[in-house]
Design a protein with these regions (language model features):
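Noncatalytic, beta-rich nucleic-acid-contacting surfaces in large DNA/RNA-processing enzymes
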Residues: 1-193
Length: 193
């Protein structure tokens, strides 16, 4: 047996996660996280990655929206048709820092370097730099044929996510370890405890 060779599509593992029986599992054992798992009913690793990133101050308020869209109770809001490709994997919810950067690139023509400057300005709450970036974002969107009000509204929606947003690679690393511990708990419960 090698933990590095397990399937990340094991329904029994997802059943355990969906049951909320996650005491002892990396990142997934708090009462709030157990409740979030039971409501989400994850069925692929991307759900665990998203939940690890969402279960933080700020983004946590978006867990119900993610779940409602995931389960078809609500239609995802992609903010603008140009952003559907970026936001579709997360049901219209901005979760990762990378999404904020991709939105700036797609909507406002930011280069990857400029998008990273925007992300850093949002994360560090530097008002002067943030105001400069907001003007750049809106001006770029205008050049892309997007109305000023729409661009300003989207900027206001992405701003808090960049502040609290989790880097997807970190969320993925945590989610893989969480899934591996869930696998061990599912198939080796005696050894697990």
């Amino acid at each position: 047996f090698s933990i590095s060779e397990i399937s990340y599509e094991d329904q029994k593992v997802f059943d355990l996660l969906s049951s909320g029986y996650t005491v002892g599992l990396f990142q997934l054992e708090s009462a709030g996280m157990r409740e979030a798992l039971m409501q989400m009913k994850p069925n692929h690793l991307e759900d665990i990655i998203a939940l690890v990133a969402l279960y933080r101050p700020g983004p946590m308020a978006n867990i119900p929206t993610y779940n409602d869209c995931k389960h078809g109770r609500q239609k995802p809001d992609y903010l603008h048709p140009l952003l559907e490709e970026i936001l579709k994997p997360t049901y219209g919810v901005i979760i990762y820092q990378e999404q904020v950067m991709q939105i700036a690139q797609k909507l406002s023509g930011f280069s990857p370097g400029e998008a990273d400057i925007l992300r850093r300005a949002m994360g560090k709450k530097k008002r002067a730099e943030l105001e400069k970036q907001k003007i750049r974002f809106i001006d770029g969107a205008l050049k892309n044929g997007i109305q000023k009000e729409v661009a300003a509204s989207i900027f206001l929606k992405i701003e808090p996510f960049a502040e609290y947003g989790f880097n997807k690679s970190h969320a993925a690393a945590y989610a893989i370890i969480a899934y591996q511990t869930a696998f061990l708990k599912t198939y080796y419960p005696n050894e697990f405890f």
